[in-house]
């Protein structure tokens, strides 16, 4: 799977209607529960539309999740933020960053009923249909289930700046050398030769191995959430 293109964006609904086909090898690792999981985790996956990066923080009564979707072609990365109180979804906030930016914010009350709804395209307010709200809600729950499996399977997202010697300075300040397949390393090197700055890379690590997810000129670390800020 050539999951390495620079991030892009498509209209929000086209992504949320898309299939959630996980990278097979990585999903196979996400099959057993582990009660020792840390409260703040980062994971992700690639499907036939693009790459999804997931940051998540669990507390005793809340789950907070941020996803970044980077389509393989045509556009820029879009983000989605979710909150659950217990198992009840309380917030959906979606942003697509393009020439016609789109923003969606939906809140649900303690009884899981819709309590607030906002939809803007290029700063102009538009209506959301009940079907659209239901779709966003359905996709949120699917992503929660996917995140559960990836966390339990120890599928970990790592990001940082690539160096000529094959090492990466991660967003946490560590210097590591990802154990990537040769084609992935060669692709990064090709991208680096056409860039005036060190490229950013995102990759997944799991018990079964590592997989390159994204390569881009942008600095992923400038906006990657941290446990303290999330």
Each language-model region and where it sits:
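OB-fold (S1/OB) nucleic-acid-binding surfaces
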Residues: 164-180
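Extended, compositionally biased repeat/scaffold regions that form elongated interaction surfaces
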Residues: 36-154, 191
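Bacterial signal peptide processing site
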Residues: 32-34
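Short nucleic-acid-contacting surface segments enriched for D/E, G, S/T with interspersed K/R
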Residues: 185-201
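Structural detector for short beta-strands of small beta-barrel domains
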Residues: 148-169
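Bacterial N-terminal signal peptides that target proteins for export
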Residues: 2-20
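OB-fold/S1-family single-stranded nucleic acid-binding modules
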Residues: 206-230
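C-terminal motif of bacterial Sec signal peptides marking the signal peptidase cleavage site
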Residues: 27-30
């Amino acid at each position: 799977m050539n999951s390495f293109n620079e991030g892009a964006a498509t209209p929000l609904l086209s992504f949320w209607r898309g299939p959630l086909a996980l990278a097979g090898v990585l999903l196979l690792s996400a099959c057993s529960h582990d009660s020792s999981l840390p409260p703040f985790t980062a994971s992700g996956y690639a499907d036939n539309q693009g790459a999804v990066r997931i940051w998540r923080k669990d507390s005793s009564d809340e789950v907070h999740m941020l996803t970044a979707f980077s389509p393989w072609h045509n556009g820029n990365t879009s983000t989605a933020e979710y909150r659950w109180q217990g198992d009840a979804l309380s917030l959906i906030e979606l942003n697509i960053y393009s020439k016609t930016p789109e923003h969606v914010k939906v809140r649900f009350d303690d009884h899981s009923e819709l309590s607030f709804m906002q939809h803007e395209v290029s700063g102009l307010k538009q209506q959301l249909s009940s079907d659209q709200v239901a779709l966003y809600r359905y996709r949120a729950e699917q992503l929660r289930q996917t995140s559960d499996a990836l966390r339990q399977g120890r599928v970990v997202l790592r990001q940082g700046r690539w160096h000529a010697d094959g090492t990466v300075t991660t967003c946490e300040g560590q210097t590591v050398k990802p154990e990537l397949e040769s084609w992935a390393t060669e692709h990064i090197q090709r991208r680096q030769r056409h860039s005036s700055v060190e490229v950013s890379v995102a990759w997944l690590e799991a018990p079964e191995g590592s997989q390159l997810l994204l390569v881009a000129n942008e600095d992923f670390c400038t906006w990657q959430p941290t446990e303290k800020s999330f």
